[in-house]
Structures are given as structure tokens and as C-alpha cells.
Amino acid sequence: IAHIEAVEDFPGLISSLNNSSILSGCVLNPDTPVEDALPILNDLDLVLVMSVVPGKGGQSFIPEVEEKVRILRKEIDMQIGNGGRKTKLMIDGGIKNHNAKLVADWGVDIAVVGSGLINNKGTISENLESITSAMET
């Protein structure tokens, strides 16, 4: 998984990885336009939408990424429906019990949880169970 902005020839990188039978993915920061990923979506195994500015744990969730997630979900579903790659949609940043259902409803396949597991509200396993339950309802 690489940030689109970090690689000069991102489509070339993805092509090279796919030609080597290596799974590939891209990261979209909160301010990265979703359109940057759409031309290569069918070549990606994973798209990770950052819901915080990367680099520091414990940041607040940025709900404005909803539109980006919903656009990607729609495009991925159409791609799969047309026999294309089964790209996974992932979100990372500020995922906690109170917003886990929200991002699940947006259509993410995977939510990365960090600081939502480690807090004074419960043990790691209790917090994980709470977040998992919220995403499944």
C-alpha cells in the first residue's frame, strides 16, 4: 500500500506489482481527490481512505471523507459486478465505538482501529468487541 502522492509514477508501480503477482493498494489522504484513484481502481486490491491526517495517533475522525468512501464503494461494486477485481475498501483514522457503525454504513470492508482500542473505557478486547459489534449492526 502506498500513498499516491509519494510515488512519481503510481500507475507504473501498480502495474509492476501486479505483473509480479504482488497485491497492491493505494492510500488516499483526506485532501486527496477520489478521482486520483479511479483510473487505476480496477488494478488495485485495496484502497485505503485516511479519515485523519496521517502521521500521529489519536487524532479526531474527519467525517468529510464520507463522500469519498461512498464514491469508491459505488465504483468498486460496479467493477465487481462487471467481473472486475474484488478491490477491498478500507478506512483508517479515528475509528472508535461511536463512529464504527457510521463507517460500516458507508460501505467499508475493513476499518483500522488504533487508539479506539486503547483507552480508559475498557480493556483492548472489550473495546474491540464493542467496535466489532457496532460495525455488524
Q: Could you say what each language-model-derived stretch is?
A:
Residues N99, I124-I131:
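Short, hydrophobic-biased amphipathic alpha-helical segments
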Residues I1-K88:
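Conserved anion-binding
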Residues I4, E8, K96, S125, ...:
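Expand to "…catalyze enediolate/carbanion chemistry for C-C bond making/breaking, isomerization
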Residues I76, I80, K121, M135:
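Active-site catalytic pocket residues across diverse enzymes, especially alpha/beta-hydrolases
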Residues T32-L44, G93-A111:
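Catalytic cores of alpha/beta
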Residues I4-A6, L48-Q59, W106-N127:
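Glycine-rich phosphate-binding active-site loops on the catalytic face of alpha/beta enzymes
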Residues V47, L72, D92, V103, ...:
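Conserved, mostly hydrophobic/aromatic
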